[in-house]
Amino acid sequence: KDIWTSISAKVDSSSGKPLSGGKPGSPVQGGVPCSAYIGPNGSGHYVKMVHNGIEYGDMQMICEAYHILASIAEMDSYEIGQVFEKWNEDILDSFLIEITADILKQSDPSTGKPFVEIVLDTAGQKGTGKWTSVNALDMGVAAPTVAEAVFSRCLSAIKEERLAAAEILTGPKLSKLDGDKSEFIDSVRDALYCSKICSYAQGFQLMREAQIEYDWNLNFGEIAEIWRGGCIVRAAFLQKITEAFNRDSNLSNLLTDDYFNECITHYQSNWRKIISLASMNGIPIPTFSSALSYYEGYRTACLPQNLLQAQ
């Protein structure tokens, strides 16, 4: 344990933000170490798998926010990068938002074009997102946002088919933004945050079911804590998850925690508006829309599966 603690990433004890310093390759001194013993029988590997599945969701949601801003608000890459940079100072403060802001502000030295615009829009996968989705199906746990993030990569990979389909299939004409641009940007941020809450709720619910199935004793607050540094999903948001499980270690779903419930209540009007606008403009938003559908399903006392059962 002492070895892992000494070489692990560290975060500030008050802010929860990752610490840096020292020589390259040397352990960071001070701070709270982002390492812990998860449990026996591969439980640590399982938690890492779910982390990666959540990561798939995070990355796809960010891509959808970018697509909406570029399409409806007609913002260029650099301008969107500035927006992401601002978002990184608030509730969306995270490694992925930070590097996305940097990427969007880069230009290709050969062509002078925005760097992101010369990157081919096809994405592969290493398998952990798929494993998370398959395991969720095996467990009977709803994790649609992670699954949609995986399917988005699958769809992106068939570039030639999409090029051909674009010449044949029809959709709505893209309409320009009608209204205040800054308010629209804030609405996209709110939609991203609400979708993120639902994605993490799915991931942590999957781990909760896994501990029952595999007879583990997972500390979910601690898991969120150690993800704050040295992980792709490291974010200020994780501190809120730790606080939620500190309030109630038996929390069934993050959505029922007071903080996250208040966030969804406050931001959901903008969340719904952005999803509606994207749909009306023919913009694919699989993780945004699946997150909202998950929320709707989870809060609905009587679902139409009574008819399914009757069938």
Locate the predicted segments by residue.
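Rossmann-fold NAD(P)-binding glycine/threonine-rich loop
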Residues: 1-8
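Short acidic-hydrophobic sequence patches enriched in Asp/Glu that either
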Residues: 1, 92, 303
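C-terminal amphipathic alpha-helical interaction region
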Residues: 265-266, 270-311
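C-terminal substrate-binding/catalytic lobe of Rossmann-fold NAD(P)-dependent dehydrogenases
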Residues: 10-48, 52, 56-280, 284-285
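Short, well-structured alpha-helical segments that form the helix of a local strand-helix-strand
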Residues: 4, 147, 289-292
